[in-house]
Swiss-Prot record:
Record's subunit section: Homotrimer.
SUPFAM superfamilies, alphabetized: Trimeric LpxA-like enzymes (SSF51161)
Reactions listed under catalytic activity: a (3R)-hydroxyacyl-[ACP] + UDP-N-acetyl-alpha-D-glucosamine = a UDP-3-O-[(3R)-3-hydroxyacyl]-N-acetyl-alpha-D-glucosamine + holo-[ACP]
Subcellular location(s) per record: Cytoplasm
MF terms in GO: acyl-[acyl-carrier-protein]-UDP-N-acetylglucosamine O-acyltransferase activity
Gene: lpxA
Function: Involved in the biosynthesis of lipid A, a phosphorylated glycolipid that anchors the lipopolysaccharide to the outer membrane of the cell.
Keyword annotations from UniProtKB, A to Z: Acyltransferase, Cytoplasm, Lipid A biosynthesis, Lipid biosynthesis, Lipid metabolism, Repeat, Transferase
Top-level taxon of the source organism: Bacteria
GO BP: lipid A biosynthetic process
Protein name as catalogued: Acyl-[acyl-carrier-protein]--UDP-N-acetylglucosamine O-acyltransferase
């Protein structure tokens, strides 16, 4: 049975499933759909064609699904789709998609968006990600699974961050980040690999292979793109080569350049 505060303003066209909790002074618009077990604390605003997945919890003063902050937006149909078991903290803002993008903003499962996170139109966020306080995503950004982004980080539109990456706090990121990398700075650059996440997701032999692969990719000669092409030719059947090198070759913004501090020996430091 759902529990809905008397002061909540809910459109009769909104769809509310079983076990939903809606707190005081929430505003729920026409096209909103809340799946089982969703919990809205007080003063949450949901508008537009917004779907919230099972057991997602949204905290006070978060605003989801309002008109994209894009001057090209002319009122066309677009969506915001949020998956299951997410925590969306106070004052977060998440916009739907636009005609100029994929017409939707997508957020996967089991993510934590801390206070004051902004997710602009047409972004795609995977699952098991943590976006710390004040993270700002411009439009059309793609973030893979198991990504951590430190507080007060700003990310340029169309940037892609691959699986297992970590972005240090107060970074300004304008280029793509390949799988399992850590980046830091303004403008952010690759500092090394995310050993903590790799140990959680991969076997030791695969971690060794990936470290060796990145050492070869980041040699001064040939270029990064040429190195990626050579690796794909020589290791066509290796899934990690495919994942990492294809990501590099598909980059339109370029890859965050390698720091001189990067070393394949980092893995042995602990």
């Amino acid at each position: 049975m759902s529990k809905i505060a008397k002061t909540a303003i809910i459109s009769p066209k909104a769809e509310i499933n079983k076990g939903v909790e809606i707190g005081e002074f929430c505003v729920i618009g026409d096209g909103v759909k809340l799946d089982d077990g969703v919990k809205l604390h007080n003063n949450v605003t949901l508008q537009g064609h917004t779907f919230i997945g099972k057991n997602t919890e949204i905290f006070p003063f978060a605003v989801l699904g309002t008109q994209p902050q894009d001057l090209k937006y002319k009122g066309e149909y677009s969506e915001l789709i949020v998956g299951e078991d997410n925590l969306i903290r106070e004052f977060c803002m998440i916009n739907p998609g636009t005609e100029g993008g994929i017409k939707k903003t997508l957020i996967g499962d089991k993510n934590l968006l801390m206070a004051y996170v902004h997710v602009a139109h047409d972004c795609v966020i995977g699952s098991h990600c943590i976006l710390a306080n004040g993270v700002t995503l411009a439009g059309h950004i793609e973030i893979g699974d198991y990504v951590n982004i430190g507080g007060l980080t700003a990310i340029h539109q169309f940037v892609r961050i691959a699986k297992g990456c970590m972005i240090a706090g107060k970074s300004a990121l304008g280029k793509d980040v390949p799988p399992y990398c850590t980046v830091e700075g303004n403008r952010a650059f690759i500092r090394g690999l995310n050993r903590h996440r790799m140990r959680q997701l991969l076997e030791s032999k695969d971690i060794d292979f990936i470290y060796a692969l990145y050492k070869r990719l980041f040699r001064p000669v040939p270029s990064l793109r040429e190195s990626a092409k050579l690796e794909l030719e020589e290791h066509a059947n290796n899934p990690f080569v495919k994942e990492i090198c294809s990501f590099i070759l598909e980059s339109s913004r370029g890859v965050a350049y390698k720091s001189s501090e990067y070393s394949s020996e980092e893995k042995q430091e602990e």
